[in-house]
Amino acid sequence: MIKIAVRSYGRHNQIWKKTLSTLSAQKDLDLGRQLVLAVTKEDYPLYKAELPEVPMLDMIIVPKGGHNATNGLVDYFPDGEPVIFMDDDISAVKCYRDIMDKDSRFDVTNLGELFEYAFRQFSEPFGFDFTPNLMFKQGKPFAEFKMRKIGGAWWGAHIDKTLLKTEQSHEDDNIRTARALHRHGGVGSINWLVAATAVGTNKGGMQSSGDRGTDERAAATKAACLTALEQAHVATYYQHDPTFIDSMDFYSLRLRGIKELRKQFPMNKELKWSTYLQENPDKPTSSLEDFF
């Protein structure tokens, strides 16, 4: 059974309105057998008191810091276990019933089926598309194998401690991505599911729990980028000049241009819409309506 790992910090009175509410709305999840929540020792009694009725497999204590939370979750599961990692501020997961209709977006209620689908397609780590904008999704398959970043808000992987554990919080997603690109030649991408989040706008959260919570935010995050670039795989796949993200008030790394990456690392694997149709021959449709 696919496990769901959620890391949270300082949001014992918010998490139920976000990720836990989203997961509880799913018709095909059994959180009592799937959900593992990682919190700090200081937060543990607050979460236990706030969430007495929430079904979960376990609540574990991890050191402060986003990377420590993820590392603790990775250590919790046995090698090879399929796990979806999620942040604590996901208020909904959106998709489109019709790939040509921007007004057909809706809240997904069958994430269990979709997680199983993703793990059937990919033995490699995979992420989800960042944007709900239909214009940027036109022409993309539901799932594909490509060179792209695995965003940190939610992603999936089979547990592999050498691949998934990192030494720093800021840029941990880029470090994992670089390792996966080096090992597998690409990562999985689920293009038509988008998590509704509010990164950096809610009190608490992983951005407040470690090396992104300092007063000198810009300087600290730029230093973290430069530290990440000391790893050979990160330096290979990412631009060497950290980029300042105005909306987030921090520095981050960007993948090298896709054309440059494709020339150096040619791709030969892609999953198209026909993948779903082949698995469901009695439902020939160009719409996702029957899928959901």
Predicted regions and their residues:
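Hydrophobic targeting segments
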Residues: 2-6, 23, 33-37
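Short, well-formed alpha-helical segments that are part of the catalytic scaffolds
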Residues: 6-27, 43-50
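Short, solvent-exposed loop/turn segments at secondary-structure junctions
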Residues: 9-11, 43-44, 65, 89-91, ...
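C-terminal catalytic/acceptor-binding lobe
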Residues: 11-19, 168-169, 174-292
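A structural signal for short, well-ordered beta-strand segments and their strand-loop junctions
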Residues: 37, 83-87, 125-129, 187-191, ...
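Active-site-proximal specificity loops/subdomain of glycosyltransferases
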Residues: 38-86, 91-107
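Conserved catalytic core of nucleotide-sugar-dependent glycosyltransferases
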Residues: 93-174, 178-179
